[in-house]
Regions:
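Alpha/beta enzyme core
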Residues: 1-249
Length: 249
């Protein structure tokens, strides 16, 4: 996820597919330094959009099809830069099929897609939006394209669609408040299922530990075990370095 200041954001989001943007330069540098590392990238326009949304906005409405065309260009630029896994987190309709077709056409058939198929309009994203410079840019909210947190059946429908369109694996986001969704997804489809322990979840644990209310390491491991118990094959978490240190002694 690149940090993009307001001064570098535009209405046409052209920076998203610029081969020299921060994300693509980082991909090439990491690929050169650590050739065997698996690299995953985020595909959405929010970090390049002047209004902070994941798609183009016209007259206050997110324009789906025009956004999908841009997302394909963004995904191809990332694949060219060395990405192994493309992670569309935008929640536009039809973007998985379009990205898969684009990758195949550009001879990137080995690049995998992890679809953020069940991404909820959540209050847990706050610290992340601050970190990537999106909070000040965002106009309105994302409830017209991210999912209602009261709805569970829609997640199953969207995941079925994205797998049919060519996703290799799926993501549930946020994580801990949606363990029921993780379990349903894995039980229903058997596909590789991941959860994103988002910035708000991470920050709550860190803040409580800093105040002496909980044991950070124990709560961290317990929370991650909850994902595994729910059926997740992997977890994206900001605790990753700490977990690695703890598990490796």
């Amino acid at each position: 996820f690149p940090y993009t200041g307001i001064e570098d954001r535009t209405e046409d989001c052209a920076g998203a597919w610029d081969p020299e943007n921060n994300a693509n330069r980082a991909l090439r540098a990491i690929r050169e330094a650590v050739p065997d590392m698996v690299l995953m990238t985020d595909v959405a326009l929010d970090t390049y959009n002047i209004n902070g949304h994941d798609g183009f906005v016209e007259d206050g409405i997110i324009v789906n099809d025009r956004t999908v065309e841009a997302l394909v260009k963004m995904a191809l630029a990332q694949a060219d830069a060395g990405a192994d896994i493309i992670g569309p987190s935008d929640m536009m309709d039809g973007r998985i099929a379009a990205i898969r077709a684009g990758l195949e056409g550009a001879r990137h058939s080995d690049v995998m897609i992890m679809s953020y198929a069940a991404k909820y309009a959540s209050a847990f994203y706050g610290p992340f939006r601050d970190a990537v410079g999106a909070s000040g840019a965002l106009t309105g909210d994302k409830k017209t394209y991210q999912m209602d947190y009261a709805n569970s059946n829609e997640a199953i429908r969207l995941i079925e669609r994205d797998l049919r369109e060519g996703a290799d694996m799926v993501m549930v986001k946020p994580g801990m408040p949606y363990l029921d969704i993780c379990h349903r997804v894995k039980s229903s489809f058997g596909a590789p299922t991941f959860a994103y322990q988002v910035s708000g979840e991470y920050s709550m644990v860190k803040a409580a530990a800093q105040n002496g209310w909980i044991d950070e390491d124990r709560v961290m491991m317990e929370s991650l075990m909850g994902f595994k118990r729910a059926g997740c094959d992997g977890v994206l978490t900001y605790f990753a370095p700490a977990v690695a240190r703890l598990m490796n002694g």
